[in-house]
Amino acid sequence: MNIFPILPGVDIAIHRQPEWQTSIKEAWSGVETTIAQRPWPRWRFSLQFEILRASVGEVAALAAFFNAQRGSFGTFLFQDPEYNSVSNQRFGMGDGNATLFQLNRAINTWLEPVWAVADTPVIMKDGVVLKQQMDYVVGTTGQVQFTAAPAAGSVLSWTGRYFIPVRFSDDKLDFERIFSGLWKTGKIEFVSKVYPT
């Protein structure tokens, strides 16, 4: 997957918004029943570029990236400037049988899956670094497959950087020429992909 280009002229204000989907049914008595439609929030992001320089190809790079995704059709990777790495993040506990575990991230006490790692993560069992390929492999959606089931009670953790798989919210992108060779964009919005667990 392609990585969203963060160019020098990006506005410092990047908005992020968790979005849930809840069905609410009300009985004739007024009693409500709520049903969560997904286990994880869908994240909405918005940003804009205050300055894009045509002379160094920034306008062309952003336009080409957007067109390569075919607007809201394609999935790409976004690295949130604040939430993009973990250190010694616990992602599971061995039970002696399971060999497949999903990497996760913590936002305070809230845990959610990491669907795309940015580089080779460091995987640890009880604080001891394991060897990739020999002890485990990491799949494209952040799942760790161990070659042997971690012993019951062993703590699994990881350190590394991650991306958020997203798609554009719209099929059009607005560029505005503000001066000769200088451009800016309107608000660019994208939404995270929610994968089955």
Feature-to-residue mapping (PLM):
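Exposed beta-strand and adjacent loop surfaces of beta-rich binding modules
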Residues: 44, 118-122, 153-155
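Surface-exposed coil/turn segments at beta-strand junctions on protein surfaces, enriched
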Residues: 40, 96, 139, 149-151, ...
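A generic structural signal for beta-strand entry/edge sites
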Residues: 42-44, 98-100, 139-143
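Extended beta-strand solenoid/passenger and fiber regions
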Residues: 60-134, 160-197
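Secondary-structure transition/turn motif
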Residues: 50, 104-108, 145-152, 194
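A surface-exposed beta-strand-loop module
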Residues: 129-154
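Solvent-exposed edge beta-strands and adjacent loop segments
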Residues: 1-69, 164-185
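Beta-strand-rich interaction surfaces with strong enrichment in secreted/lumenal proteins
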Residues: 34-35, 89-90, 146-148
